[in-house]
Amino acid sequence: RLGGGALRNQQDGLIFSQAGALEVQAGSLDNRQGTLQAQGDNRLRIGGALDNQGGRLDSRAGNLDLQSGSLDNGAGGVLNSAKGWLTLVTGLFDNSAGVTQAQSLEIRAGQGVRNQQGHLSALGGDNRIVTADFDNQGGGLYASGLLSLDGQRFLNQGAAAGQGGKVGAGRIDFSLAGALANRFGQLESESELHLRAAAIDNSG
């Protein structure tokens, strides 16, 4: 268990719990190009910013439980729970050009999600997201089971064919207070597809 104010684990730094759980409590965490890994549960409580650009937060056999003021997982950052679930409660979640994956996902990001060129996937179950605007331009959003999104706008468009975002799931249920922009984007469900939005642009 680690605690403190500002925690830095940059540039190939490694914090690893080989036999069990890892718990971190800090005012902020800078994990750029660093790794925080646990064999069991990996639990982080960060009061302010969690910067994981190019870094890795891992649970090998447990769950990944994250709370932070904001989370930047861009520039090749990885959030991974190989065999368990991942829960995230944060303000702005930036997953641009990052990878977030687990058997199931539950994300609450009060200030929005940025997933441009990113990959956000529930490999074995549901992917449930509650947020403000979700920007998936050029990104991938997936679930083996249900993909549920409650939010404001969903931006999935591209400038030309093949450049929009990709959404795929066993079932899709979107409830949006704002617009769904899907020009040159792709939304594909294996079974049910429910879209509720103030406006839908599906041209292209």
Identify the residue ranges that each predicted region occupies.
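Short, T/G/N/S-enriched strand-turn elements that build extracellular solenoid repeat scaffolds
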Residues: 10-16, 31-37, 52-58, 73-80, ...
